[in-house]
């Protein structure tokens, strides 16, 4: 009886295993591939990173729906907003099997208006072809609140 209780307690106390570090590395690599493909304006490489139903909500409020709109918008945005893009992923979470959320900082440096510093979130789904981007959300930080007088 005590062995059964001890076994039950140990099963209940166990936390779910963390996803393999290989998955986290793969998710981070997809983000790197995305930045590299944008830098090269490589339409085919960008397209290959997204699911068919992908969407992207930009920092300007444009909502691109569907892979082809995301690809066109990404290339157009890179042309309209020149500069060196850097995405630094700070956290990767796996809220469900085959689903990843990568959050980080997004900076466009060297543009005519100086550096743009934003936040970004990538949602990815695992498929037979590996991890693919299903959604991107880019956000500008809110300005600091005014001091009370």
Regions found by a protein language model. Name each.
Residues 2-5, 9-52, 68, 134, ...:
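Short, low-complexity N-terminal intrinsically disordered segments enriched in polar/charged residues
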Residues 27, 83-85, 131:
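Proline-centered linker/hinge motifs at extracellular inter-domain junctions
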Residues 45, 55, 100-101, 132:
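General beta-strand recognition
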Residues 50, 60, 91-93, 104-106, ...:
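A mature extracytoplasmic/lumenal domain signature
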Residues 54-65, 76-80:
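A short gly/proline-enriched turn/hairpin at secondary-structure junctions
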Residues 69-116:
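Surface-exposed, charged secondary-structure patches
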Residues 117-144:
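Short beta-strand edge/turn micro-motifs at domain boundaries
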């Amino acid at each position: 009886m005590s062995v059964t209780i001890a076994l039950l307690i140990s099963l209940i106390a166990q936390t779910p295993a963390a996803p393999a570090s290989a998955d986290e590395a793969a998710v981070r690599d997809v983000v790197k591939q995305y930045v590299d493909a944008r830098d090269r304006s490589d339409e085919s490489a960008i397209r290959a990173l997204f699911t068919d139903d992908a969407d992207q909500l930009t920092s300007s409020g444009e909502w691109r729906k569907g892979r082809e709109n995301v690809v066109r918008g990404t290339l157009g945005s890179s042309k309209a907003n020149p500069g060196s893009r850097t995405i630094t992923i700070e956290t990767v979470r796996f809220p469900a099997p085959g689903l990843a959320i990568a959050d980080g900082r997004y900076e466009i440096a060297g543009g005519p208006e100086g550096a743009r510093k934003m936040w970004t979130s990538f949602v990815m789904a695992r498929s037979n072809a590996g991890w693919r981007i299903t959604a991107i959300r880019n956000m500008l930080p809110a300005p600091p609140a005014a001091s009370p007088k």
